[in-house]
Amino acid sequence: MDLSKFRPSSAYDSPFLTTNAGGPVYNNVSSLTVGPRGPVLLEDYHLIEKLATFDRERIPERVVHARGASAKGFFEVTHDISHLTCADFLRAPGVQTPVICRFSTVVHERGSPESLRDIRGFAVKFYTREGNFDLVGNNVPVFFNRDAKSFPDTIRALKPNPKSHIQEYWKILDFFSFLPESLHTFAWFFDDVCLPTDYRHMEGYGVHAYQLINKAGKAHYVKFHWKPTCGVKCMSEEEAIRVGGTNHSHATKDLYDSIAAGNYPEWKLFIQIMDTEDVDKFDFDPLDVTKTWPEDILPLMPVGRLVLNRNIDNFFAENEQLAFNPGHIVPGLYYSEDKLLQTRIFAYADTQRHRIGPNYMQLPVNAPKCAHHNNHRDGAMNFMHRDEEVDYLPSRFDPCRHAEQYPIPSRVLTGRREMCVIEKENNFKQAGERYRSWEPDRQDRYVSKWVEHLSDPRVTYEIRSIWISYLSQADKSCGQKVASRLTLKPTM
């Protein structure tokens, strides 16, 4: 163990097996017993330590995004956007920032087949000179619900039945029938994009609106888009069944093998920019996470490229203990008023403290690469060696000072304290536009998924009728096609 770096090092390795305390182990095969056939003795310390360590190897899996794979690389700025943001890592073309990226499925468990229909996570941690920036997104640009109060129920509805531990669509369709805004996400979820061939051939989105702030303090809303340079590829249902039956880790293997062979995955980063004064000029709320921004009005602007050129060294240390948090931003970036984003800022840090421990940010994969200093101290599994006497601020014995203030949005927000739904719900327009943009065979696959799951015997006539109504309000012909195959009449 290299004590200066708190990591295993060949220079510090013992030539023989030892206990955790460094004591020599001369037999790693046979337990200490009373005679060759007698009972095992508790004084076999190495046996007890070995079993106790094994019993505690696993940590709680993520409540969402449990199944995933990670890789390292860099982000390079290719286009100047310094007029939009004072973020140091975006300061000029050519600037490179080390990153680690994690791809995942959202609902399914750790160890589940990566070929299952699901939204995919697309999270990038930028180790910038001003701290970590975590862009925690998905491979679809929208989400099922716009308010985090529904998020726990959303995930429970999507996850297996608590009685049988089987994922059942009657639960999903029952719950989301109360959330008409979810139809837009279903227009992605039941589409081909939720069966990506692998992680290298899928897009990524920041999902939420954020804000970019320049040196003058001018703010713009921004949305982030990742576009794979090797194109988007998806599987059919039949291909997904075959691939999953052959190798349940096919996407992880593809990512690892591609990087090992020097075929480095690459994505281009684009942004959409909206003036903060223009949010009321649309027929929807631009800060509603169930909506996309029209690219004909707010075109994609190129920013940079993401290249993954290094495999992780240890799956547990750099995938299972890897922790993302949308609350991690840097100067020149800020949150929007998106209700779901605002609550993710708390929820992600909270779940990491539960899953990994209160000092999860000390782990090498999570710690910033830049200099950092605060008085967050001690706690379970703290391994930071600190010898200072002053553990408070301000102090005349500690030269640490406040950082220089950086620009943040200065808009004045007023309103009553209330729990309410946004004014411009417009739940069906974008779902219909997406459906009409597809070729007929793609439309038919989408219709077939609805028919398949609405045919579940536990889906009631009322639930079917509600979904036919939603689909018809999005696109009349789509609703009619689903209804005719279910022998129901659309209500719209």
Curated annotation (Swiss-Prot):
Coiled coil: none annotated. The keyword Secreted does not apply. Its EC number is 1.11.1.6. The active site is at H65, N138. Heme binds at Y348. One of its GO terms (biological process) is hydrogen peroxide catabolic process. It holds the Pfam family Catalase-rel. Inhibited by salicylic acid. It is found in: Cytoplasm, Cytosol; Peroxisome matrix. This is Catalase isozyme 1. Its cofactor is heme.
